[in-house]
Amino acid sequence: MTDFSFACTGVRADRYAAGPTLVFRLRVTAAAGARVHALALRCQIRIEPARRAYGAAEADGLSDLFGERSRWGSTLQPVQFAQVALMVPSFTGEIETDLVVPCTYDMDVAATRYLTALTDGEVPLLMLFSGTAFTGDGGFQVEPVPWDREAAFRMPVTTWREMIEQHFPGCGWIRLPRDTMDALLAYRSRHALTSWEATLKALLGDDGGGNGDGGDDGVLAPPARDPFRALTGSTGRTDP
């Protein structure tokens, strides 16, 4: 059976993609210069948080994921980042190819929350490979790529931030249930608010002059049947 090894040699943000996308440069090596007709790969990418240090601000941002820093010895577990498929074309011995990984800025996804909390340095990644190889010099042979094939890589945090800024410059992104979105739309229309930023600031009582729906202390006190109750109901939070 052909022995395969994998290495990640770099990563870049794809500035021409329709959505946030990272492109990892992958080197695939077949032992003894074996002839490979094609390689159908499955790649699982994990973040390994325990393989880097964190500043105080980063630790605060990660508390929702891993709890208090004193507990990190047991809670700093791997986080799933992506799972993608790749078809590698014919090669002999060694080849380099691109592994395209679509990403999300959904703050409900653990990997996104982790990456957003980082201020600098590198993201420790582990790529796990499996799949099917079609090999043979004078014929055609089908072989499995065993599950123990892997490659470690440290992705610069700046690459992630560059990718996000290309698609969401200066912005964040959250996912809401449809009924909550309908409630927000109704609230925005009823109060003739010109933007989503203004809508959320009004709900938070952050209009700068104390004239919005918030009280004197800046805390929102929604009236009966106000759409904000739909927000608190969908998120599991209690009303002020």
Per-region residue spans from a language model:
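Internal, hydrophobic beta-strand segments that form the core of beta-sheet-rich folds
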Residues: 41-48, 96-148
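A short beta-turn/strand-edge loop motif at beta-sheet boundaries
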Residues: 31-39, 193
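Short aromatic-acidic-glycine turn motif
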Residues: 46-57
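Short beta-strand elements
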Residues: 60-69, 134-173
